[in-house]
């Protein structure tokens, strides 16, 4: 498997009126992995649906999208544009195993990022009792342990993530690969160079896992 690819950086779908497109990855990234790992009719899951890029592209390519989204505005905006809108659940991905999802063929997402020197934990909506980077990584492992139960055996799972510069550097790619490989089999790390990307965002990382 090639561990370095180049894809066009173009955000094709307009952002919703309530926020910019800063949280989404380009549609080209989803197309690449759907071509690589899925076929028409396959069930594609995104546990952190965000602005719906994975789900929209999956539906456009004849796959069946499923997902979860915690933010009510994002959920309503995405669900309102999906043909399979009932497959998107408004709720906490930490409860994915309780939603009654069918077995999935493929999973792709960009989870909420967290810097190691921050206390506000996006996976707990900032609950002070769940603050800190260690609890973030622990929660991410627990979420993917649940996701594994709704995936078919040997199903491929892609996690897009970036290292976070700043006053304290966060090696998020390394930390997520080590954390999630405790519940999934790490197959590869693919570096994606952006053709036409922003000056401060020339590449990203995709961790490739296989369900055990």
Identify the role of each PLM range:
Residues 1-212:
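Class I S-adenosyl-L-methionine-dependent methyltransferase catalytic core
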């Amino acid at each position: 498997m090639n561990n370095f690819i180049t894809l066009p950086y173009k955000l094709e779908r307009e952002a919703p009126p309530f926020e910019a497109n800063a949280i989404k990855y380009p549609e080209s990234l989803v197309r690449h992995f759907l071509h690589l790992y899925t076929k028409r009719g396959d069930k594609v899951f995104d546990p952190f649906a965000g602005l719906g890029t994975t789900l929209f592209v999956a539906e456009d390519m004849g796959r069946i999208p499923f997902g979860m989204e915690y933010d009510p505005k994002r959920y309503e905006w995405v669900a309102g544009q999906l043909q399979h809108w009932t497959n998107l659940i408004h709720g906490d991905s930490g409860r994915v195993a309780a939603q009654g999802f069918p077995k999935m063929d493929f999973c792709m997402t960009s989870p909420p990022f967290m810097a190691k020197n921050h206390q506000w934990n996006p996976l707990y909506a900032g609950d002070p009792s769940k603050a800190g980077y260690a609890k973030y990584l622990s929660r991410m492992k627990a979420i993917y342990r649940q996701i594994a139960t709704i995936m078919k055996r040997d199903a491929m799972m892609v996690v897009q993530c970036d290292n976070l510069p700043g006053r304290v550097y966060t090696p998020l790619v390394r930390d997520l690969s080590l954390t999630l490989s405790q519940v999934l089999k790490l197959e590869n790390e693919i570096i994606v160079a952006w053709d036409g990307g922003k000056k401060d965002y020339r590449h990203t990382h995709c961790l490739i896992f296989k369900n055990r």
